[in-house]
A protein has these predicted regions:
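Conserved nucleotide-binding/hydrolysis micro-motifs of P-loop NTPases
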Residues: 73-75, 113-114, 150-153, 170-175, ...
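P-loop NTPase motor domains
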Residues: 1-132, 206
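Helical "lid/switch" subdomain of P-loop NTPase nucleotide-binding domains
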Residues: 126-129, 150-154, 158
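A short helix-turn-beta junction within AAA+ P-loop NTPase domains corresponding to the substrate/partner-engaging
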Residues: 157-169
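Conserved P-loop NTPase motor module
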Residues: 200-236
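Phosphate/diphosphate-binding loops
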Residues: 184-198
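Conserved H-loop
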Residues: 110, 142, 149-150, 161
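Conserved catalytic network of the ASCE P-loop NTPase/AAA+ motor domain
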Residues: 59-61, 96-101, 134-140, 157-160, ...
Length: 236
């Protein structure tokens, strides 16, 4: 736009330029291959019926006992929504399933601090859904397992509903104090050993055992790709 003596200045678009910036961001999402599953979906099941898709996810035909949903390639900003949607669908499936007692489901949430944050960190659709499952799921045959390296960042409502804890090495005082609040008072002193646990060692506390145990987990052979990189051996 030209004003006065011919000086040219940029003119903001509608809504003070916010709409233009929104269109640019939207175009970026549409062309991002990581979002292709949402904007250019493929037919993953033989039909578009929800019950058929759920049957495939839950392997209702009994051909397998474990289903792994790998969300590592999903953009971080929508992982929360996807986890919430999947957890709610599975919970509702067993909620209305008349044979729920013959079809118990365990949902395992890896790296839970990324999408099941404590209430002080922010809102989370996934957290609200999983909190409901933690409180009501047992009646409908749906239980949860929460895995996290930072328990202090995970919803206390969810962790407090857990009956058993497998606690590995923790050196952060905030995490240690958080665990002390979760375990029974008579076992709180055991948390003091957490910083001294070696790799593969864990402290098990809960209703599944008559008394707390300090155990050594056998190392897998061959080691998975997720094992720690031995920096010192590679650099020396």
């Amino acid at each position: 736009e030209k004003i006065g003596s011919g000086t040219t200045v940029a003119k903001e678009g509608p809504f003070y330029g916010k709409f233009t910036r929104f269109l640019v961001r939207l175009d970026g999402k549409l062309n991002d291959p990581r979002y292709a599953f949402m904007f250019r979906p493929k037919m993953y099941a033989q039909t578009a019926k929800l019950k058929d898709l759920l049957s495939k996810i839950l392997v209702a035909d009994g051909s397998a006992q474990v289903t792994i949903l790998d969300l590592s390639g999903v953009p971080f900003d929508i992982v929360n929504t996807i986890v919430s949607l999947l957890a709610r669908l599975i919970f509702d499936f067993n909620f209305w399933n008349p044979s729920r007692r013959d079809f118990p489901i365990l949902l395992v949430f890896e790296e839970a601090h990324n999408y099941l944050p404590s209430s002080g960190i922010g809102t989370s659709a996934a957290r609200r859904t999983v909190e409901r499952i933690a409180k009501e799921g047992r009646k409908y045959g749906v239980s949860i397992m929460v895995v996290s390296q930072r328990p202090v960042e995970v919803s206390e409502t969810i962790l407090s509903q857990c009956n058993n804890y497998v606690i590995m090495r923790l050196t952060n005082p905030l995490d240690q104090n958080y665990i002390k609040r979760l375990v029974p008072d008579s076992f709180a002193g055991l948390v003091d050993v957490l910083p001294s646990l070696r790799q593969g060692e864990a402290l098990i506390v809960g209703e599944a055992i008559s008394m707390p145990l300090r155990v050594q987990v056998d190392f897998p052979k061959p080691e998975p790709d997720s094992s720690d990189i031995k920096f010192y051996e590679k650099w020396k």
